[in-house]
Design a protein with these regions (language model features):
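Periplasmic/cell-envelope proteins involved in peptidoglycan metabolism and beta-lactam response
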Residues: 2, 10, 191-194, 437-443
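Generic "edge-of-domain/loop-turn" microfeature
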Residues: 6, 18, 23, 92, ...
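Domain-terminus/edge residues, biased toward the C-terminal soluble/receptor-binding domains
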Residues: 199-200, 211-216, 220-423, 430-450, ...
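Long, low-complexity, intrinsically disordered segments
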Residues: 456-466
Length: 466
C-alpha cells in the first residue's frame, strides 16, 4: 500500500514539474557578478587587494556571451566591461550588437530619460513645478540634488535641465508630481509608455532611478526608450546644453548653475564629437550605467551599457567604432525581394554587416502595417508598408497559416495538461486494480488458512473421540 502511495505521489510530482517547466516560467532574478564569487586569496595564501578582485570581476564580465556574435557572418563585437550592452540603429531600430540585452538590470539615473519623455509628452515648458516636502525626501547624502526648498517653484524648462544635466533626484520627483497629478500616477504613466514602446523587461517604481528591487530595465528596452525620447527636439536641445543656470526663484535669491555630466559631450579625455546626447547613472546596486547617442555620416545609433564596474566611456567608443565601421544601411525600395510590399518610404532601410546580404533576410508584415526585417531572428530594420496587390492573396494565405499556427501554439499547453492528466488517471486506475487484485489474493489466502485451521480442528476432535 505504501509503495502505491509513493508511486502516486511520484507521478503527481512529475506532472507538476512538467507543467511548471513546459507551460510557466519563473520570474527572472536580477543578479550581478559579485565580489563574493571571486576567490579572496591567491594560490600562495595571500589576501587579494580590492583592485585585483575588481579586475577579476571585470574579466568575468568581458567573458559573458554576446548574442549577436553567434549570428552567421556577423562581425564580432568588442569585449566590454558591462554585464549587458546594446547598439541600436536609431533610424530603423536594428540591433547591431547585443550582450545580455534582454536581462533585467537596475538602471539608476538613466531612468530620467523616460521621466523626460513622459513629461515632454504631457506638459508645457512654461508649466510651474512646485517642490513638495515629499520631493525633498530625495535629497539624501551622496545622491545628486540641487538643494531645492519646500514650496519653491521653477518652470518645466528649468526642471528638465536640472534633471538631465545635474541629475537632480528631487527635481525628477517634483516633475512626476506636477505632470502626473500624483507621483504614483506619474510612475504608472511611465510603465504604460514603456509597454507602448514594446518594452518587455522593464518596470519603474520611481522617476529618478533611486534603488528599488522592483525597478529595472533591460538594455534593449532602454534603447527603445532612448530612441523615442531623442526624437523629441526639446530633449535634444536640453541634452546638448553644456551649462545651464536657473535664475532666482520665489524662495532662492541666488542662481543655480550646473554642467553637463556626460563626459563624451564636454572637452576632456573622453570627448567625442560624434556624441549628441546621453545620460549617466550610478548606484551601489546598479554599478555604472550609461546611455549615449552618436552620429557619423548621417547615421545615428544609441548605445546602452548596464552593470559596468569601469571603462564605460572607452567601451562606448569601441562600440561606436564597431557599428560605424562594420555595418551599412541598405535601402529597402532598391531591393528586388521587397517588391511584394508597397507604400514603403524611400528612406526606409535595414542595417546589416557588410558580409550579410539583403536576400538572406526574412520579413514580417504585421496587421498594423509595421514591416520588420530579421536576420537569423535578430531585428535589422523596422518601417511601415502595405502588401502589394499581386501578393495580397498570397499574404492572406500566409496570414491564415500564421493564425492556424498561433492557434495550435495556444492550444498546445492545454493538450499537454490533458495528456498529463490522462497519464495520471491511467496510473491511478492501474494502481487501484493492482490494489484490488492484491486485496482479493489476501482474502483468498485468509479463506485458505481458515479452512486449513477448521480441518485441523476437525482432525483433533476425531482423535479425541477415538
Amino acid at each position: 500500500m505504501r509503495k502505491g502511495i509513493r508511486l502516486i505521489a511520484s507521478v503527481l510530482a512529475g506532472a507538476i514539474f512538467m507543467l511548471n517547466t513546459g507551460i510557466t516560467s519563473c520570474a527572472e532574478e536580477i543578479t550581478y557578478l559579485l565580489e563574493e564569487d571571486i576567490e579572496k586569496t591567491t594560490a600562495d595564501g595571500k589576501e587579494k587587494e580590492p583592485k585585483e578582485i575588481k579586475k577579476e570581476i571585470i574579466e568575468k564580465a568581458k567573458a559573458l556571451p554576446v548574442e549577436t556574435d553567434a549570428l552567421k557572418n556577423w562581425t564580432k563585437g568588442p569585449e566590454i566591461c558591462g554585464e549587458a550592452g546594446i547598439v541600436m540603429d536609431m533610424d530603423n531600430g536594428a540591433i547591431l550588437y547585443g550582450k545580455s540585452m534582454d536581462r533585467k538590470y537596475y538602471p539608476a539615473s538613466i531612468t530620467k530619460i523616460m521621466t523626460a519623455l513622459v513629461a515632454l509628452e504631457n506638459s508645457q515648458m512654461t508649466d510651474t513645478v512646485t517642490f513638495s516636502e515629499q520631493s525633498l525626501g530625495c535629497q539624501h547624502s551622496g545622491y545628486a540634488h540641487i538643494a531645492m526648498k519646500k514650496d519653491e517653484q521653477i518652470n518645466m524648462r528649468d526642471a528638465l535641465h536640472a534633471m538631465m544635466l545635474a541629475s537632480a533626484n528631487e527635481v525628477a520627483y517634483a516633475i512626476g508630481e506636477t505632470v502626473g497629478g500624483t507621483y504614483e500616477h506619474f510612475v504608472q504613466m511611465m510603465n504604460e509608455r514603456a509597454k507602448e514602446l514594446g518594452c518587455e523587461n522593464t518596470h519603474f517604481m520611481n522617476a529618478n532611478g533611486m534603488f528599488d528591487e522592483n525597478h529595472y530595465v533591460s538594455a534593449r528596452d532602454m534603447a527603445l526608450i532612448t530612441r523615442e525620447a531623442f526624437s523629441k527636439s526639446e530633449l535634444l536641445e536640453i541634452m546638448q546644453t553644456p551649462q545651464y543656470t536657473i535664475p532666482v526663484t520665489n524662495i532662492a535669491q541666488e542662481e543655480r548653475t550646473f554642467q553637463q555630466k556626460h563626459r563624451m559631450m564636454v572637452q576632456g579625455k573622453y570627448y567625442d564629437p560624434r556624441c549628441f546626447g546621453g545620460k549617466t547613472g550610478y548606484t551601489d546596486q546598479s554599478y555604472n550605467t550609461l546611455v549615449t547617442a552618436m552620429e557619423e555620416n548621417g547615421r545615428k545609433i544609441v548605445i546602452v551599457i548596464l552593470g559596468s564596474r569601469d571603462h564605460t566611456y572607452e567601451d562606448t567608443k569601441a562600440l561606436a567604432d564597431y557599428a560605424f565601421q562594420n555595418f551599412e544601411q541598405i535601402k529597402i525600395t532598391e531591393q528586388e525581394t521587397a517588391k511584394k510590399y508597397s507604400e514603403i518610404s524611400e528612406t526606409a532601410c535595414v542595417t546589416i554587416p557588410k558580409d550579410v546580404e539583403f536576400k538572406d533576410l526574412e520579413s514580417e508584415l504585421k496587421p498594423n502595417g509595421e514591416l520588420r526585417y530579421f536576420y537569423e531572428g535578430n531585428l535589422v530594420g523596422v518601417t511601415t508598408a502595405k502588401l502589394a496587390a499581386e501578393h495580397k492573396i498570397e499574404g492572406a494565405a500566409l496570414k491564415a497559416e500564421q493564425q492556424e499556427k498561433k492557434a495550435k501554439q495556444e492550444t498546445k499547453p492545454w493538450k499537454m495538461i490533458w495528456i498529463i492528466l490522462a497519464i495520471v488517471l491511467i496510473v491511478i486506475s492501474l494502481l487501484v486494480i493492482l490494489l484490488q487484485i492484491r486485496a482479493a489474493k489476501k482474502r483468498k489466502e485468509r479463506m485458505r488458512r481458515r479452512r486449513a485451521m477448521q480441518r485441523r480442528r476437525q482432525q483433533q476432535l476425531r482423535k479425541r473421540d477415538s
